[in-house]
């Protein structure tokens, strides 16, 4: 179940959605305090706890905990994770394919989700060619159904980091990517949801064992983020707390 199961109101094509209004620069996290998951806002070296959650009107609880030593969880539990493939031209070329003429969409199940520090149990008995894909993940802040790109952008709560782990051998073997990209733990997410950033100017960098492997920017997307979101909502409603992975650069 999503952390924000109740719709915040529909978003018509000419009406801005009722997304939670938060100051730009806010960084939301989910963490474990006293053995239970809670929401908070990063404030310097502390997390200021809030209730109930960022997808509706929230308030500080008055309690603060130190970031150091805190167990951070995936910053949201979405009803669905939607992803777009081959959304960087250099990555499409790297994969030996043509640039899509429309967003290439697929789903990852909720069981793919992991927190930012959680270990990944790679299915090495199934695949010997498991690869990383660093991506910008968009966290939806309002119910979006059949909306324009402008309305879709206004319905974004913020962005976080994702790794769209992929079994390349299975991706080549099957035309549907559910098995290649939907295995348990294939979507590490977090650590924070950052608000107020320019969706068209986000840098994407991926390191593997200290080596920089990917370095791109959302300015190079084939389909920009508002366009991707609007395209999804033509057929599938996005709910508050849903996550959209926006593509990976070459590397």
Tell where the protein language model's regions lie, with residue ranges.
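N-terminal non-catalytic cap/leader segment that marks the start of a structured domain
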Residues: 1-104, 197
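Catalytic-pocket segment enriched in acidic/His residues
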Residues: 2-7, 11, 71, 91, ...
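Residue-level recognition of short, solvent-exposed, well-ordered loop/turn junctions
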Residues: 23, 115, 131-133, 239
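Conserved "cap/hinge" positions at secondary-structure junctions
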Residues: 33, 140, 246-249
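Structural signature of FAD isoalloxazine-binding scaffolds in flavoprotein oxidoreductases
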Residues: 99-116, 132
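N-terminal accessory regions of nucleic-acid-interacting proteins
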Residues: 145-160
